[in-house]
C-alpha cells in the first residue's frame, strides 16, 4: 500500500530537524536551513521504501541493470521526490502552516553538479523511468566535487568558477563506506606460473579507495526506490604522521591530494597530456569500483560466476565507461581463475553499449603509451581481445588490410574505445532512427556488416514527471482536468488532448497558461539579467551545450540579419521577438566561447537601441542547468533545433519543448525527424539541407561558401559586421576567427564546416514563416496544443520498456510497504 503522510507529524519532523541541525527554533531558521530540514524529513519518508525495495530485489533474486555513465544531470531532488511520493499538496500545506512557501524552499537546493549535457540528462530520465516502471537498477557514476563549472558571464565572456554544490553537504545522499573498494593504477604486471597456468599479478601500483555514496531515485507512486551510486575517491592512508613530524607537510598529505584530483571536476580539459591522463583515470576509477562491487554482490548469493550475466547487465552510456569490458575480463581471469573463452562468453553476455554521437572527436581514443602505463593489466587484456578480433576479421575478409585498419581496437598507436565496446557487447544501439541508420550505413558500417545482429535503435525519451508535472504545474493540472492523470505514468494517453485542439475555449486556456509561464520566465530574466522582456513577444529559444554543430552561430547571425532589416526600415511590420540563449561552452573550446561573447555583444547593441522600439531583444541566460531549464521549456513559443543534419544523434531538448507546447523550427536531424512523423511537418517549421545532402557534400570535400558571400549582399553585410567593429568597436578583430571559420581565410578547417551559410536563406525563410504564423492566434494555439498531444512517443518510459524488452530482459518488481 502507499502510505500517506500525517501533516502534523511532518511539521514536527521539520521543526525537530531545524533544532537538531542548527540549534534554532523554526522562526529563526534561514530558508537554506529549512530546506535541509525539509529534505531530511522527506528522506525519512523515502528510507522505508528504499529498504523495502532492496529487500524485494533480494527476495526475488532479481536481475539488475548497472547503468554506467560519466554524467547524471539530475536536477534538484526535493521537488521531484515530493511529486513522486505523491505528497505535494500535503507538504506544501504543512510548510505554509509553518510560514514557508514550498517553491521558495525548493529554490534553496543547488543542482547536483554531476553532469553537463544531454548525455547526463538522458541518464537521469532513464533512472526516473526505471524506478517508476519498477525495474531493478543502479546508476553508476562519479561524485564530482565541483562538476563541470558554474558559468558566470562577465563583459560578455564566459567565466568558469567551481560549482560548490557540496559546500553545505547534500541531504539526500548516504555514504556507504562498508562498500569501499580499492582501485589500482600504474605499476607493472608480473607473470607467475603455478604448474598449470599463468597468473598475472599487478605490482608497484598506486591505489585509491573508491567510497560509494547512494542517492535514492524514487519511482512515481509505487514505493520503488532505486539507487544512484556515485563514487568518491579517497586515499588508503590519508595522512602520514611520520612525514608530518619530520616537517614534510606536503608529503604528509600527498596521497590525499592524489585521490582528490580524480573526483575534482567533470571533463578536465584534455588539451594537454595531464588532462588526458586524468580523464582516463576517472573512467577506470568509477568503472573498476562499480564492476568489482557488482561481482561481489552477485557472489554473496551465488556460487557459479559463469551465470553472472543472468543477474547483471552493464549498460555503457557512450564510450566513457567502455573499459568495463576489460575490467570484467580482468576479474574473471585473474580473480575467478576462468579460462579466456569462458570469461569472454560471460563478458559479451553482460555488456551492452549505447553510441551517442557520430562526431569523431567524441569517439574516444587513448595513446597506447598512456593507456598501458596507467592500466598495465587492462592493456594486456585489450591487446589480447584485439589480437583475437583481428584474427576473426582476417578469417572473414582474407587479405583485406583496409578492414583491419578500420576495425581494429588497437591501431596506429591508439586504443579505440568505441571499437572495444562494440566487440565486447551483445547489443549496440543508436538513439534515434536516423542516427542508427547513419551508424549502420556510414560510421560503423564495417561492424554492422560483420555483426548485424548486435545493432538496434532505441529512440531517446524524457520523463514527463519532471518536465511537465514538476516544470509546468499549470499545464499539468489543465491536462489532468481534461483527460485524467494516466499520462503521468503512460504518456501515450496524452493523445486524448487531440479532441480539444479545435475548441476555442481550450485554445484560450492553453495559451493563457503559456502566457503565465512567459511571465514567470520574464521575471527570472529581469532578476538575473536586468533586461525587461515583453511576455507578448515571441519567445524564441535555443538552450543546449554550445557546439559548432548545434549552430548557435547561425541563430545569432540571423538575429544580426533581422536587426539590419529593422535599422533599414524602422517601421517594418514584425511581431516583437525575444531570442533566448542558454549554453555552456567547454572550458578549452575557444570558438564556442567566442560565440558566447558574440551573442552577448549583439545583445548589448540591440537591447540598448531605442530606435527599434523593443521589437527585438536578445537574452543569454547564465549557467543553464536543469532547474532553470524547467522554467524555460514551459515558457517557450519557438524551439530552435537547428543542428547540421546528420550531426545531432537524437536531441532531447526538442522533446521537452514539444511536450510543453512550443513549435519547432528545425532541420530533419536526430529525433526531430520522428517528431515530424508524430505531429506532421506542416505543424513544424522545417528547413535546410537533409542528412543525405550534407553527407554527400562532406564526401566531396565540402562546398564553396565564398560564392554565397559574393552573391548574397545580406549575408555579406552580416559577415562584414563580424570584422568591422560593428559589435566590438574597441576591438574590431575580436570575431575574426568566426569570420575565418565560415569563409576559410587562414582557417585550418574546411570552410563553413557545419554549412551555416548554405542553410542560412532557408533558415531565414522559416523564421519569417514563424512571424506570419504567430499572427494567426487560432492556428498557433491549435498547433501548440497538437504538439503537446503528439508527444506521447517521447517518454523515457517508452524508451526504457524497449531497452528491457530487447536488451536487458529485466522483470518488474512490486514493492508493498508493511502497515505502519
What label would you give each PLM region?
Residues 1-820:
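A conserved ligand/cofactor-binding region detector
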Amino acid at each position: 500500500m502507499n502510505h500517506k503522510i500525517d501533516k502534523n507529524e511532518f511539521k514536527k519532523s521539520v521543526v525537530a530537524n531545524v533544532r537538531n541541525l542548527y540549534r534554532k527554533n523554526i522562526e529563526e531558521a534561514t530558508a537554506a536551513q529549512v530546506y535541509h530540514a525539509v529534505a531530511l524529513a522527506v528522506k525519512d519518508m523515502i528510507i522505508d521504501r528504499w529498504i523495502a525495495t532492496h529487500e524485494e530485489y533480494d527476495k526475488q533474486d532479481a536481475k539488475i541493470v548497472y547503468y554506467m555513465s560519466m554524467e547524471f544531470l539530475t536536477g534538484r531532488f526535493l521537488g521531484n521526490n515530493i511529486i513522486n511520493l505523491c505528497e505535494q499538496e500535503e507538504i506544501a500545506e504543512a510548510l505554509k502552516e509553518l510560514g514557508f512557501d514550498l517553491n521558495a524552499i525548493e529554490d534553496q537546493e543547488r543542482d547536483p553538479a554531476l553532469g553537463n549535457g544531454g548525455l547526463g540528462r538522458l541518464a537521469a530520465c532513464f533512472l526516473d523511468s526505471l524506478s517508476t516502471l519498477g525495474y531493478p537498477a543502479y546508476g553508476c557514476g562519479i561524485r564530482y566535487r565541483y562538476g563541470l563549472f558554474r558559468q558566470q558571464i562577465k563583459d560578455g565572456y564566459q567565466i568558469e568558477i567551481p560549482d560548490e554544490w557540496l559546500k553545505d553537504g547534500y541531504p539526500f545522499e548516504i555514504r556507504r563506506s562498508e562498500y569501499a573498494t580499492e582501485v589500482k593504477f600504474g605499476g607493472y604486471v608480473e607473470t607467475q606460473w603455478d604448474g598449470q597456468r599463468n597468473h598475472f599479478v599487478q605490482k608497484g601500483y598506486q591505489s585509491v579507495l573508491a567510497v560509494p555514496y547512494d542517492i535514492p531515485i524514487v519511482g512515481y507512486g509505487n514505493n520503488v526506490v532505486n539507487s544512484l551510486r556515485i563514487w568518491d575517491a579517497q586515499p588508503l592512508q590519508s595522512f602520514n604522521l611520520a612525514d608530518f613530524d619530520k616537517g614534510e607537510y606536503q608529503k604528509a598529505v600527498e596521497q590525499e591530494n592524489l585521490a582528490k584530483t580524480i573526483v575534482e571536476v567533470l571533463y578536465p580539459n584534455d588539451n594537454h597530456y595531464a588532462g588526458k591522463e586524468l580523464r582516463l583515470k576517472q573512467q577506470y576509477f568509477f568503472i573498476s569500483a562499480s564492476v568489482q562491487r557488482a561481482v561481489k554482490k552477485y557472489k554473496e548469493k551465488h556460487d557459479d560466476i559463469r551465470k553472472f550475466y543472468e543477474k547483471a547487465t552493464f549498460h555503457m552510456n557512450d564510450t566513457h565507461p567502455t573499459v568495463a569490458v576489460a575490467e570484467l575480463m580482468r576479474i574473471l581471469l585473474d580473480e575467478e581463475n576462468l579460462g579466456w573463452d569462458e570469461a569472454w562468453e560471460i563478458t559479451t553476455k553482460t555488456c551492452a553499449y549505447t553510441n551517442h554521437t557520430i562526431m569523431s572527436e567524441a569517439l574516444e581514443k587513448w595513446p597506447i603509451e598512456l593507456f598501458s602505463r596507467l592500466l598495465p593489466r587492462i592493456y594486456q587484456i585489450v591487446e589480447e581481445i584485439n589480437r583475437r578480433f583481428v584474427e576473426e576479421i582476417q578469417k572473414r575478409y582474407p587479405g583485406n588490410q583496409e578492414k583491419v585498419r578500420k576495425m581494429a581496437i588497437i591501431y596506429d598507436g591508439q586504443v579505440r574505445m568505441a571499437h572495444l565496446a562494440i566487440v565486447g557487447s551483445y547489443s549496440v544501439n543508436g538513439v534515434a532512427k536516423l542516427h542508427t541508420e547513419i551508424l549502420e550505413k556510414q560510421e560503423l558500417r564495417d561492424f554492422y556488416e560483420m555483426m548485424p545482429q548486435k545493432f538496434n535503435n532505441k529512440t531517446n525519451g524524457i520523463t514527463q514527471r519532471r518536465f511537465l508535472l514538476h516544470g509546468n504545474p499549470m499545464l499539468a493540472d489543465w491536462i489532468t482536468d481534461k483527460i485524467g492523470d494516466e499520462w503521468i505514468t503512460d504518456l501515450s494517453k496524452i493523445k486524448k488532448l487531440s479532441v480539444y485542439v479545435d475548441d476555442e475555449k481550450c485554445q484560450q486556456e492553453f495559451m493563457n497558461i503559456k502566457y503565465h509561464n512567459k511571465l514567470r520566465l520574464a521575471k527570472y530574466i529581469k532578476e538575473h539579467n536586468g533586461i525587461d522582456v515583453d511576455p507578448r513577444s515571441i519567445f524564441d529559444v535555443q538552450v543546449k551545450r554550445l557546439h559548432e554543430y548545434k549552430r548557435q552561430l547561425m541563430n545569432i547571425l540571423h538575429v544580426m540579419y533581422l536587426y539590419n532589416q529593422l535599422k533599414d526600415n524602422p517601421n517594418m511590420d514584425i511581431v516583437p521577438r525575444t531570442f533566448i540563449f542558454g549554453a555552456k561552452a567547454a572550458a578549452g573550446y575557444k570558438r564556442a566561447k567566442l560565440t558566447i561573447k558574440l551573442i552577448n555583444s549583439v545583445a548589448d547593441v540591440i537591447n540598448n537601441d531605442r530606435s527599434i522600439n523593443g521589437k527585438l531583444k536578445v537574452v543569454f541566460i547564465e549557467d543553464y542547468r536543469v532547474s532553470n531549464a524547467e522554467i524555460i521549456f514551459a515558457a517557450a513559443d519557438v524551439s530552435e533545433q537547428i543542428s547540421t543534419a546528420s550531426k545531432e544523434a537524437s536531441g532531447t531538448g526538442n522533446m521537452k519543448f514539444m511536450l510543453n507546447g512550443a513549435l519547432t523550427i528545425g532541420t530533419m536531424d536526430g529525433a526531430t525527424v520522428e517528431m515530424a512523423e508524430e505531429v506532421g511537418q506542416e505543424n513544424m517549421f522545417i528547413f535546410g539541407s537533409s542528412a543525405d545532402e550534407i553527407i554527400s557534400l562532406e564526401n566531396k570535400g565540402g562546398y564553396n561558401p565564398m560564392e554565397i558571400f559574393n552573391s548574397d549582399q545580406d549575408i555579406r553585410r552580416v559577415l562584414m559586421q563580424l570584422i568591422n567593429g560593428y559589435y566590438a568597436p574597441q576591438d574590431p578583430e575580436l570575431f575574426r576567427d568566426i569570420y575565418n571559420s565560415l569563409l576559410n581565410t587562414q582557417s585550418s578547417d574546411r570552410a563553413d564546416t557545419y554549412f551555416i551559410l548554405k542553410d542560412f536563406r532557408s533558415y531565414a525563410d522559416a523564421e519569417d514563416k514563424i512571424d506570419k504564423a504567430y499572427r494567426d492566434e487560432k492556428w498557433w494555439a491549435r498547433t501548440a496544443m497538437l504538439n503537446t498531444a503528439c508527444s506521447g512517443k517521447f517518454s523515457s518510459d517508452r524508451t526504457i520498456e524497449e531497452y528491457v524488452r530487447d536488451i536487458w530482459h529485466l522483470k518488474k518488481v512490486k514493492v508493498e510497504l508493511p502497515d505502519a
